[in-house]
Curated annotation (Swiss-Prot):
Chain positions of site Lowers pKa of active site Cys: 188
Protein name (database record): Octanoyltransferase LIP2p2, chloroplastic
Catalytic activity field: octanoyl-[ACP] + L-lysyl-[protein] = N(6)-octanoyl-L-lysyl-[protein] + holo-[ACP] + H(+)
Transmembrane segments: none
Organism from which the protein derives: Arabidopsis thaliana
Pathway named in the protein's UniProt entry: Protein modification; protein lipoylation via endogenous pathway; protein N(6)-(lipoyl)lysine from octanoyl-[acyl-carrier-protein]: step 1/2
UniProt GO MF annotations: lipoyl(octanoyl) transferase activity
Compartments it resides in: Plastid, Chloroplast
Cross-referenced InterPro entries: aa-tRNA-synth_II/BPL/LPL, BPL_LPL_catalytic, Octanoyltransferase, Octanoyltransferase_CS
Tissue expression: Expressed in roots, leaves, cauline leaves, stems, siliques and flowers.
Functional description taken from the UniProt entry: Catalyzes the transfer of endogenously produced octanoic acid from octanoyl-acyl-carrier-protein onto the lipoyl domains of lipoate-dependent enzymes. Lipoyl-ACP can also act as a substrate although octanoyl-ACP is likely to be the physiological substrate. Together with LIP1P is essential for de novo plastidial protein lipoylation during seed development. Acts redundantly with LIP2P.
Chief place of localization: plastid
Positions that bind substrate: 123-130, 191-193, 204-206
Length: 280
């Protein structure tokens, strides 16, 4: 049994690259770090967290990581063995992704002469953009240990982002009837696109933090016309009491809040893992 649900995401070529390879090497030798929120229940399930939020990881590599983790977990399940949940959080270099049934009619360019790489993936939904300044979360979790309900899972992912925007940035975001994702007015702040196989999830959500939204002009994001995309930085700068924060500060704040709220919403104990484990 395999399900796919429409996805979409968000971008920012403005992100500086000066926090990349040195941090990547540090992650490879870092020790496991536990993140646990006091509001979680007494014995929460463990979730291994591959935290690469300050790095630009090529889409193809992250996609391969997800499928590798997914296959490992499915093999354990087939043997009736327990497996922990997993989460990858990162940024991507500029890239467009499409779902299995995506239409090229939503591309405002010739796919043979695309401005960035274009990947067609297993997820549902239409074309979207990922890029620097957008935090992407890929949960690979066993819904048998949570709730075997795709709508429940989607609403929980939305809840994570709504909480982050409210608690970290005082932004009042909400759901929009008939659409998946998180919105402020008619601006989509976060896109959600998942695939579920044997009740194991992959793909996930993307939150525009300091994202340069220009590349969205080259597509019809998620196939939704007459609605725009937004970013945390853009909304903060438009606010009445704007206090200038550097892009890296905004990303740090959003990252910390995403992990905290994900831990609370899904009642998981986050345990940071080294990148080396992904590449073994």
């Amino acid at each position: 049994m395999v399900f796919s649900v429409a996805t979409s995401s968000v971008t920012n070529p403005k992100l500086h690259h000066h926090h990349h390879l040195s941090d990547f090497n540090r992650n490879r030798v870092s020790t496991s770090l536990k993140i646990m929120n006091s509001k979680n229940h007494t014995n929460p399930r463990k979730c291994e967290c591959f935290d690469l939020y300050d790095q630009l990881i090529p889409y193809k590599k992250a996609w391969s990581w997800q499928k590798s983790i997914l296959n490992e977990k499915k093999a354990l399940i087939d043997k009736n063995q327990e497996c922990s949940d997993s989460l990858i959080i990162l940024q991507h270099p500029s890239v467009y992704t499409m779902g299995t049934g995506s239409s090229e009619n939503y591309l405002n360019f010739d796919i043979k002469n695309a401005p960035f790489d274009v990947y067609r993936t297993e997820r549902g939904g239409e074309v979207t953009y990922h890029g620097p300044g957008q935090l992407v979360m890929y949960p690979i979790i066993n819904l048998r240990n949570h709730k075997m309900d795709l709508h429940w899972y989607l609403r929980k992912l939305e809840e994570v982002v709504i909480r982050v925007l409210s608690s970290a940035f005082a932004i009042n975001a909400s759901r929009l009837d008939g659409f998946t994702g998180v919105w402020v007015g008619n601006k989509k702040m976060a896109a959600i696109g998942i695939r579920v196989s044997k009740w194991m999830t992959y793909h996930g959500l993307a939150l525009n933090v300091t994202t340069d939204l220009t590349p969205f002009n080259s597509i019809v994001p998620c196939g939704i016309r007459n609605r725009g995309v937004g970013s945390v930085k853009g909304l903060i700068e438009d606010g009445e009491h704007y206090n200038k924060l550097e892009d890296l500060q905004l990303l740090d704040i959003a990252h910390e809040s995403l992990l905290k709220e994900f831990s609370e919403v899904f009642q998981l104990q986050m345990e940071k893992q080294t990148v080396f484990k992904l590449e073994c």
